[in-house]
Amino acid sequence: MFSVHIADVTHVTLAFMKSSIFNGKPPSKWPLFTDVETVRKKFPKKDLAVLIAIGGWGDTRGFSAAAASQMGRKAFAENIKAMLDSTGADGVDLDWEYPGGNGEDYKQITNSEKSWEVGVYPKLLAEIRAAIGPDKIMSAAVPGKPVDIQVAFTKDTLVEAMEYLDYVNIMTYDLMNRRDNVTAHHTGIDNSLIAIDTYLNNGVPAEKANLGFAFYVKWFRTTEECAQKALGCKTVEMEDPKTGRDLGQSGAFSWHDKIPTELKKSFEKAVPNAMYDDDGNYYWDAEEKIFWSWDTPASMAKKFPAIVQPRKLGGVFAWGLGEDANAFIHLKTLNAVFRKYLKL
């Protein structure tokens, strides 16, 4: 039964509303693919929190426009309050990827043109908190890749931001992406721990930090060099160096998705023949020259004694629930291991 799998879920975030909706006059009806009460009834926990996520990858314009002035921040915040009042949601999750740059448009709008956003990010949060009050939840999705963390935050802005945020969901996945040129685990233990420690060392309280899990698989085309070693070897060029356009040499699919036809043969080799080091699960297909990276239930479970427990983190989250359907094998693992963690 699906209800058994979700019995331990405490927070559900509905993604996404576009950030630009909150810049001007509020719409007569907020664009949500479902309604909060319908979602609430699907989950057993009486005190389930349902949040609305704003933004997501590639959606930065509304955040930038709001952050640029005090008037813009105030309007943005008041519209978020209106949306929460109208939908009955328990809070808002801000997915600005990312203040300061390194987003989808990083080749079109340089990081230097967006550097001003770093300093005003806490000001935007302050305005939203003032508008929605202390009883509504406000969280943020934040990057896990070191180069993105460095662009988005300073220690001072993180410390100030945490005055207003209830918690941060640290995206400890996609830690290898098409901008890289050597293979690595996309959600490994070591690179996840580096991300977590970066936030903890820069002012994020452990109890407000959540570790992210990926319910999907990633693949990357490589050079012949990977025949010598699959990790740390060169990939082919995966992104246009001038435009940032995806060259189709990497990708992802979830456990719920149909495996793309052109990848099916390779992935069917990868699953039973996967390698595991102390950091994570991977496979290199010598015939197709494809590097695969994904979390198995076993590798997910290892992140608790390696990261969650010693760092005393507040929780864990996954992107995203539907991506683990219909078997929910990875969700079951998170539930079981987190229950054990809570007893320690």
Predicted regions located by residue number:
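Glycan-binding loop/region signatures in secreted carbohydrate-active enzymes
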Residues: 54, 213-306, 333-343
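Short, acidic/polar
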Residues: 1-8, 67-86, 146-160, 292-309
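Conserved, mostly hydrophobic/aromatic
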Residues: 12, 52, 94, 128, ...
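Mobile, glycine-rich extracellular loop/lid and propeptide segments
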Residues: 55, 91-99
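Substrate-binding surface in catalytic domains of secreted glycosidases
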Residues: 22-31, 99-260
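Generic structural signal for well-ordered alpha-helices
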Residues: 33-40, 77-84, 118-129, 158, ...
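Glycan-recognition patch characteristic of GH18 chitinases/ENGases
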Residues: 1-84, 331-336, 343
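Short, well-ordered coil/turn segments that N-cap beta-strands
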Residues: 9-10, 46-50, 88-92, 134-136, ...
